[in-house]
Amino acid sequence: MPPYRSRTTTHGRNMAGARGLWRATGMKDEDFGKPIIAVVNSFTQFVPGHVHLKDLGQLVAREIESAGGVAKEFNTIAVDDGIAMGHDGMLYSLPSRELIADSVEYMVNAHCADAMVCISNCDKITPGMLMAALRLNIPVVFVSGGPMEAGKVVWEDSVKKLDLVDAMVAAADDHYTDEQVKAIERSACPTCGSCSGMFTANSMNCLTEALGLSLPGNGSTLATHADRKRLFVEAGHLIVDLARRYYEQDDESVLPRSIATFSAFENAMTLDIAMGGSTNTVLHLLAAAQEAEIDFTMADIDRLSRRVPVLCKVAPAVSSVHMEDVHHAGGIMGILGQLDNAGLLTTSIPTVHSETLAKALDHWDVTRTNSEMVHKFYSAAPGGVPTQVAFSQERRFDKVDTDREKGVIHSKEHAFSQDGGLAVLYGNLAEDGCIVKTAGVDDSILKFSGPARIFESQDSAVLGILNGKIKPGDIVLIRYEGPRGGPGMQEMLYPTSYLKSKGLGKACALITDGRFSGGSSGLSIGHVSPEAAEGGTIGLVREGDIIDIDIPNRKIHLAVDDATLAERRAEQDAAGWKPAEERKRKISTALKAYAAMATSAARGAVRKLPD
């Protein structure tokens, strides 16, 4: 049996000094020999998705100790992508994922913790902790802070649901008065929690359920609802049980790499495609798979995207549906249940809470079970009161939405589309692939052809859109915004939001080697690989070049002959692969270090040491 890692610091005469320090943290004689569980929190007052986490780490810690473990809490950083958006702060967002993963590794290995409970929530925090968990491969349970309630505003004599993107779009739309914009701003983000749509944060928290590393309801139970407290309480007890099973019973099946297998990654990606998750999830799943030493690639995502239908449409794809509505329809277990019915999942694999996913679905899918407890759990409703306090309300819907024909979650037979919600496109513009969230693309522009309007940065693209330089039929092309070129692979939420505000959301396309917020919609194609900074064809496109986009056939093509491209490549090799116009960006040493090691989006933008 593997020895408890913590005994490296708690046992033996030579560890008297270390034990003295442990005692100074509150440990007593009877604690030495118990599993030491790291409570990996991410509380910060900068981020609404994390502002309520301050006391939740200690809630988990108390449950760990009541179950016979020793809990030690520490914090990671957490960047709010919405606040960092639209300025140089966004350069730090993706690199923060690596810092989070490293900080968890540093703390857990330096102090020889035996297991972890990861309390995450927003965009890069869940992926960073997931990467660390698979890197360390010690028992882990994920429990996130939960989604915020959707905003609501009275608009033209009716109540309209809102989220962060609505505020951005309205602010750039001259049809809205200052007073109307202010009303939307004040109502868009009413509570603590991750932004209310199927954006990156919620997408990733949902995927932890499919990977088998979190409890049912983790992705959809509102941050404000009292039911969410149960997830934290159960996580504290569960992690002690998992630690004992591994260290005392030699049960390797509880380890994250035994749970998050290739099949689990397929399940997670299948879920992502079916629910129209954020394109950022592709980046993060690829990165996590590499940490787990799993050969899960863009080719696998492409394969899955061709057979998985869209079973759930959530904001930004449908403005009236938010995470509270997904939960009301049975949450992630409800979507997984329909995917299983369609034969699209591997359900023989384990989870942290169940012997197999199949058994979990039998208990937790509201269309399969008559359990009063399960139906009550998924009837949790928004409270409708602005608050930053977790578990502060107990409102419920009268009954759960089990309509799989016209409800929030559809069966395969009644799918929104038999073609998946995410697609990988290939062609001479993206030899290693690029990603589009098809769930947010209008059917009328699934095939699109137009002239490229070149911008060497997100900033110049924003100015071009706001100043009326983009016309219907144009393709906005933003380059040198990839992992190396940015550096940091900025999100392009402002350009997509501004196109929408100008009435161009269904009349233009946007292509970039950067990435998109989970709040982006429209014909937005990102993660173009190779990126411009590493010699990708996107760096050879010139103003007015025609680009053909064919989503049904998964193709993207720059209509320039090979000989001309070869000439341009020779010229660019001589000039250097850098933006044609100077950018006023302060690139710190930290960002330069990230850029020096960053790989392409097709590899998850993970770091790779130079040969």
From Swiss-Prot:
GO terms for biological process: isoleucine biosynthetic process; L-valine biosynthetic process. One of its GO terms (cellular component) is cytosol. Binds 1 [2Fe-2S] cluster per subunit. This cluster acts as a Lewis acid cofactor. Keywords: 2Fe-2S, Amino-acid biosynthesis, Branched-chain amino acid biosynthesis, Iron, Iron-sulfur, Lyase, Magnesium, Metal-binding. PROSITE patterns: ILVD_EDD_1, ILVD_EDD_2. This is Dihydroxy-acid dehydratase. The keyword Metal-binding applies. InterPro entries: Dihydro-acid_dehy_C, DihydroxyA_deHydtase, DiOHA_6PGluconate_deHydtase_CS, ILV_EDD_C, ILV_EDD_N, IlvD/EDD_N. Belongs to the IlvD/Edd family. It catalyses: (2R)-2,3-dihydroxy-3-methylbutanoate = 3-methyl-2-oxobutanoate + H2O; (2R,3R)-2,3-dihydroxy-3-methylpentanoate = (S)-3-methyl-2-oxopentanoate + H2O. GO terms for molecular function: 2 iron, 2 sulfur cluster binding; dihydroxy-acid dehydratase activity; magnesium ion binding. Signal peptide: none annotated. Homodimer. Its cofactor is [2Fe-2S] cluster; Mg(2+). Mg(2+) binds at residues 81, 123-124, 491. Its EC number is 4.2.1.9. Pathway: Amino-acid biosynthesis; L-isoleucine biosynthesis; L-isoleucine from 2-oxobutanoate: step 3/4; Amino-acid biosynthesis; L-valine biosynthesis; L-valine from pyruvate: step 3/4. The gene is ilvD. Pfam families: ILV_EDD_C, ILVD_EDD_N. PANTHER family: D-XYLONATE DEHYDRATASE (PTHR43661), D-XYLONATE DEHYDRATASE YAGF-RELATED (PTHR43661:SF3). Functions in the biosynthesis of branched-chain amino acids. Catalyzes the dehydration of (2R,3R)-2,3-dihydroxy-3-methylpentanoate (2,3-dihydroxy-3-methylvalerate) into 2-oxo-3-methylpentanoate (2-oxo-3-methylvalerate) and of (2R)-2,3-dihydroxy-3-methylbutanoate (2,3-dihydroxyisovalerate) into 2-oxo-3-methylbutanoate (2-oxoisovalerate), the penultimate precursor to L-isoleucine and L-valine, respectively. The active site is at 517 (proton acceptor). It comes from the Bacteria. [2Fe-2S] cluster binds at residues 122, 195. The lineage of its organism: Bacteria, Pseudomonadati, Pseudomonadota, Alphaproteobacteria, Hyphomicrobiales. It is an enzyme of class 4 (lyase). The modification N6-carboxylysine is found at residue 124.
